[in-house]
Amino acid sequence: MSITASALSLTVADPEQSARFLEEEFGFEREMSADGFVSLTRPDVAFNLIFLRAGLETFKPRDRAGRTAAGILVVLVVDNVDAEYERLHAAGTEILTPIETEEWGERFFQVEDPNGVIVQLVQWVAAPPASVVA
């Protein structure tokens, strides 16, 4: 199999709100949009992030069209998580979790978009210990 592109599609109540949040806070760019659909991209991200309106008439399978994303983390690995924390805090973005460093070397914090999608910014500050590497 040869994968030529990839995308993550999330079903939310208001795709425009989620798209604006990622455009304004994280520099994503709108690649295309239509009623109930927004596709975002960034040159340094390997996938498109797509927001679909819950109940969208063209959603397949149809019996799942009304469900919204829950328990989803969109993880963005950055060079300097502390600088991103300060930037977002200064901009008035609500921070869900303060910066934490896990024993496996992941330093992160979380924010939430208007539809409840959690965006986690991560910086790897140390190699994970052998006990957690597969």
Positions of predicted regions on the chain:
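Conserved active-site tyrosine of GNAT-family acetyltransferases
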Residues: 18-23, 88, 116
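Short glycine-/small-residue motifs
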Residues: 118-121
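Vicinal oxygen chelate
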Residues: 1-7, 29-77, 85-112, 123-134
